[in-house]
């Protein structure tokens, strides 16, 4: 796929030799990162890209170099998506920032509330959507983990689930009472109606009674995002970012968040502390009396 992209840059885009060589260098470096982490190119997720950017940052690369790598990845994955090599573009929300702040997008509390209030819970699909969004925000699951959930992965009585992340690593993740309530409603009503006469071990189903696809859920979430004007920054992974950010903003331990997210390397989790630090500074300058006075006098 990389070779085909390079040929496209040469034959159709007519880029200079030096520019093409930069693309080759960046993509070779990226492919080596994927290979060392046992990640298939076709299965790269938003989190993998965020992890790669964090890796570049922690390896001491300059902001200019990292921004070039991001630009390369955005163009590469846009090409793969347009060629229908991948069902979803994981680099869609990966932006080249004006200032060097490689921070994942997340929702505010108000945006989360608006999103959670959108599904029509009088319908089977609305009950499903409500349960999926509540569970995603409550657990920080990857979208692949969410759609792969089976009925026997849930312990409703104790309010936790078992998921199998990257490398088939098992982890136990608790979920909220709200998520529990909407899960029970969906399981006892909406899921039965979606299932009809079929049998399925999977928790979340489409209108044909089959396991909902990653792309299908992506489209559902984007449609909700359009209704409240946050489509540009909303994806399944945005809710994972939001889960981590909100936990840290409310004092959660970084190591605990790492375990809940299923990160093998804590440096991937540490990127969320930058967001929380920005939030702390905002609170300080807004509410500390001497900080406000100094700011007013400047």
Residues of each region from the PLM?
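Conserved catalytic core of the tyrosine transesterase superfamily
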Residues: 1-298
């Amino acid at each position: 796929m990389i070779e085909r992209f390079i040929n496209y840059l040469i034959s159709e885009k007519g880029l200079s030799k030096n520019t093409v060589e930069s693309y080759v260098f960046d993509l070779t470096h990226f492919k080596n990162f994927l290979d060392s982490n046992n990640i298939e190119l076709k299965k790269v997720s938003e989190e993998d890209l965020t992890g790669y950017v964090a890796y570049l940052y922690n390896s001491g690369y300059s902001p200019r170099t990292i921004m070039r790598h991001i630009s390369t990845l955005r163009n590469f994955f846009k090409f793969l998506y347009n060629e229908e090599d991948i069902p979803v573009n994981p680099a869609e929300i990966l932006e080249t920032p004006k200032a060097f702040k490689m921070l994942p997008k997340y929702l505010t509390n108000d945006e989360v509330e608006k999103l959670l209030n959108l599904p029509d819970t009088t319908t089977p699909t609305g009950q499903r959507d409500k349960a999926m969004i509540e569970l995603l925000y409550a657990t920080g699951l990857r979208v692949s983990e969410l759609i792969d959930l089976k009925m026997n992965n849930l312990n409703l009585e104790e309010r936790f689930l078992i998921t199998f992340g990257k490398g088939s690593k098992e982890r136990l993740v608790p979920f909220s009472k709200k998520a529990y309530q909407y899960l029970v409603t969906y399981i006892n009503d909406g899921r039965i109606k979606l299932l009809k006469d079929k049998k399925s071990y999977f928790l979340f189903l489409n209108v044909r009674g089959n396991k909902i696809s990653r792309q299908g859920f992506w489209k559902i979430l984007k449609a909700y995002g359009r209704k409240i004007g946050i489509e540009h920054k909303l994806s399944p992974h945005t809710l994972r970012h939001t889960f981590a950010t909100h936990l840290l903003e409310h004092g959660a331990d970084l190591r605990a968040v790492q375990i809940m997210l299923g990160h093998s390397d804590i440096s991937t989790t540490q990127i969320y502390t930058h967001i929380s630090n920005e939030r702390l500074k905002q609170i300080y300058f807004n509410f500390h009396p001497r900080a406000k006075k100094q700011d007013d006098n400047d």
